[in-house]
Amino acid sequence: MSEATNEPVLACEGLSKTFREGADALQVLDGVTLAVARGERIAIVGASGSGKSTLLHLLGGLDVPSAGAVRLHGRDFSRMSDAERGRVRNEALGFVYQFHHLLPEFSALENVAMPLYIRRMEREAANERAVAMLKEVGLGHRLDHAPGELSGGERQRAAIARALVTQPACVLADEPTGNLDRRTAQSVFDLMLSLNERLATSFIIVTHDEQLAGRAQRTLRLDDGRLA
């Protein structure tokens, strides 16, 4: 996790993204500026196709901007080499998506520990941390179950545990409740808010659900490529 400091955990300035195909150009983001404090939770709403997912991809270092900069712990994330950006991303950011993307051939425990295995953490230590995180999300009794043996809400809880097991400074969540029924979505959102408060991990949550977005500390709207 990030140290307690006035410096934003994650920030972007003048962020723009244009996709080109032949002579055609489509500007999806136009001069977006955002700063995320340690432990802050921000919701981003907007119409379908407004660029919300593109913004998360840029903030997470999964794509590079056409203009502007992304800074992670004050470092110019968008100007790093692919290898360095990948290393820093894996150390400081967690990701949750609408679909859980759990690996079906592995148990819940193994799925959650996978980012630590990739870091070459000693297996016993990785499993111990994964067990603790699964208990945090209420799945301590489902460690050995495969994703196919979990409910939709449980799979998303496991995905959240996987995002947090590396102790990231910020979690980027793209429609994390979009594939769930209303009651389960509420439960998963409650869990994220609780983890945000207990772990002091920042959350940026893209959602189409205005009611859930209203529970964030800040709700921002992306419209015509601009954030307001």
UniProtKB/Swiss-Prot annotation:
Would I find Magnesium among this entry's keywords? Answer: no
Pfam families, from UniProt? ABC_tran
Q: Which GO terms describe its biological process?
A: lipoprotein localization to outer membrane; protein localization to outer membrane
> One MF term from GO for this chain?
ATP hydrolysis activity
Q: Where is the ABC transporter domain?
A: 10-228
- Per the record, the domain of life is Bacteria
The cellular component terms of Gene Ontology attached to this UniProt record, alphabetical and capped at eight, are:
plasma membrane
The protein's Enzyme Commission number: 7.6.2.-
Record-linked InterPro entries: AAA+_ATPase, ABC_transporter-like_ATP-bd, ABC_transporter-like_CS, ABC_transpr_LolD-like, LolD_lipo_ATP-bd, MacB-like_ATP-bd, P-loop_NTPase
What keywords are annotated for this sequence in UniProt?
A: ATP-binding, Cell inner membrane, Cell membrane, Membrane, Nucleotide-binding, Translocase, Transport
Q: Does the keyword Translocase apply?
A: yes
Record SUPFAM superfamilies: P-loop containing nucleoside triphosphate hydrolases
Where does this protein hold ATP? Answer: 46-53
Q: Which family does it belong to?
A: Belongs to the ABC transporter superfamily. Lipoprotein translocase (TC 3.A.1.125) family.
- What role is this protein assigned? Part of the ABC transporter complex LolCDE involved in the translocation of mature outer membrane-directed lipoproteins, from the inner membrane to the periplasmic chaperone, LolA. Responsible for the formation of the LolA-lipoprotein complex in an ATP-dependent manner.
Question: Subunit structure, per the record?
Answer: The complex is composed of two ATP-binding proteins (LolD) and two transmembrane proteins (LolC and LolE).
Q: Can you say what this protein is called?
A: Lipoprotein-releasing system ATP-binding protein LolD
Supply the source organism for this entry: Aromatoleum aromaticum (strain DSM 19018 / LMG 30748 / EbN1) (Azoarcus sp. (strain EbN1))
